[in-house]
Amino acid sequence: AAAKYKEIIENEDTYGYILEPDIRTLTKEPEANYSKEIVFGEFHNKTKNYFSGPKSELPEESGGWCDYMVELEFFKSMPEGIRKDAWFLTKVTMTGQERNPETGRYPLLNWDDPATNQKHPYWKKNIESSDWVFNYDDGYYETKGISSASGKTRMIFRYADILLLYAEAVAYGTKSIDDLAFDCMWRVQERAGVPLISKDVTKEYFQKAVFNA
């Protein structure tokens, strides 16, 4: 496995894969639809009725269906940073309440606020559509009234996975950690906005770090 991953990584220009510089690009439609980071994904075309359903990953207070939620311990264990901010929906738009007369916006509460009915945060990375767009500048969802139709490609396997799978294969299948494995870890960690692993760590520490990356 390590040999095949290494071949892909060392020839990423030939294969055409990239690690998007800004992880938030992967959460946006249409930017993410044809991202070269996606190795395998479900492409959707809402104009042809082959669309994904962003309502499945939204809380009920926002008009969602509450089908997919984030496992709570996984959420708590992920290091704070740009990746966590991009991946998880931690704010609930209370669409059933009155809008703010000055901003025209619905109240926005933390997912664990007692006023919500939520016990888990939600995934943010799959829900953007033309009707439901996250404004990163002020941390707010701009909604025209959400639709179940989205043309966003759902990511199943990304180039980031290949980088980490190589690091994992080296960590568990060889006697020592090579420079490429460290480089793969650093690329993923740097983009995630978390501290980079030191080359002085033990093999056991590296194994755990790959699992948590």
Which residues make up each language-model segment?
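Short coil/turn linking the two alpha-helices of tandem helical-hairpin repeats
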Residues: A1, Y172-K175
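Conserved catalytic neighborhood of penicillin-recognizing serine enzymes
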Residues: M185-A213
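Elongated scaffold/linker segments in the mid-to-C-terminal portions of large proteins
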Residues: E7-L163, Y172
